[in-house]
Amino acid sequence: MDRRNFIKNTGWSFLGLAASGSLLGSCAAGSKEAKKKMPSASDLKMYWGDLHNHCNITYGHGDMRDAFEAAKGQLDFVSVTPHAMWPDIPGADDPRLKWVIDYHTGAFKRLREGGYEKYVAMTNEYNKEGEFLTFVGYEAHSMEHGDHVALNYDLDAPLVECTSIEDWKQKAKGHKVFITPHHMGYQGGYRGYNWKCFTEGDQTPFVEMYSRHGLAESDQGDYPYLHDMGPRQWEGTIQYGLELGNKFGIMASTDQHSGYPGSYGDGRIGVLAPSLTRDAIWEALRTRHVCAATGDKILIDFRLNDAFMGDVVRGNSRRIYLNVTGESCIDYVDIVKNGQILARMNGPLTPVAPEGDTVRCKVKVDFGWNREEQYVHWQGKLSVDKGRILSVTPCFRGAAFTSPQEGETEFHTHVNRIVSADEKETELDMYSSKNPNTTTAAMQAVILEVEMPKDGKVIADFNGKKFEHTLGELLEGSRSHFMIGWLSEAILFNRAMPESCFTVEHYMEDKEPQRDTDYYYVRVRQRDGQWAWRSEEHTS
């Protein structure tokens, strides 16, 4: 499809340098047109994980085994992370903070009295090379330097004691360990990140930009910090660090405290690697071939000249190739250069239904909206009567805890599962809880990628109730159903998303260097509020 017809037929529009670029069309990555422009990345695949999350092994909720089971259900790799130390813990003379000190130091003591050995043993138990990878890691808090997580290559890595984050980094030299700062936007001196302590290189190849705490891309925009640790400010953010000239990858993880790694919407890391092996994933992490996503597994193929994400390239002329495949309608795609929008590609306000009878679409089905506090157990199947299901992507959430609070009681993690899936149906076993407020979701969901005729039906058969809609109906808009009646749990068939609204491929050139070293990164926003960011590339 040529540029004029693509814009006319799909509702996309382009601003900045993108307006003068070469639109390759709405298509799968690696089209014939793209291959003429840029090298293929067909030998690499995006793998998804969570490298920072918590359960009741220290302070948090949910059993550790359930945490690994939950991770297996929707991730490729994980590190379930105990809290290990806080060398500069404050408040020794402040009665107001006594419970905080006791709570933390008690957990550190339990970890050293057998908890760490139990954790390492279970991490080894769940590690399956080529299927599901696990990593040993642990967290250290710091008022001065900000909180960090150590991620180890070795599955028998010891717990290393330290007197500060800088001492920790010194002791880790020569070992295969990444030390990664997180929730970076808090105030300096109060567990926000101190960029004066950043050391570029293999020990800290990436930083955690997004989690349940919020988004530290800048001091503006979506996902402000709302935790009682304080507001988000400028000096700890990613853009502040980039403006200092630092080079690092950007990633996300949940920092979840209810034993549900990968909890949908709380943060995930994507790693571009040739295989799901420890060596391949570790090397991709080391070389900054990483991306960040809030929840949806949005694929971003962004290259400058022949370089991939996280790389450093040289040259005044930069050939930019971009291919994005979302899980829902794309709101916009930004190419950011030196903190400013170089180009923006706007997706359609309303997806345009494709011509023809048989179409490829993505249909998300949500389950939840409980009236009562008790969990609703969803058991049943989603199916199609015509065409086929190409893939089933889980969007499973854990309980909405960012951190434990005084007086909270323990609870059992309810692990959601895709029991089976084939081209005609998928069997699901899920638990939804009441949305804790009108801005925090607790529903469970899956995304069906389908190829089927418009008169084919998408059918939900759960808990003795059956609802169905044709794909043609869902292309017109979403449909919802209460299970019992008003003020009861509900099912939502979201609007069917045609390929033209969640996929775009683009090529352009930037011939204007601005600095000795320019940095670029890509960010993608979907209309449902899901985000993804591709690690920056630097050009000298």
Residue locations for each model-derived region?
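N-terminal export signals
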Residues: 5-26
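Extended, charged catalytic domains and RNA/DNA-binding interfaces, predominantly
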Residues: 12-14, 27, 33-540
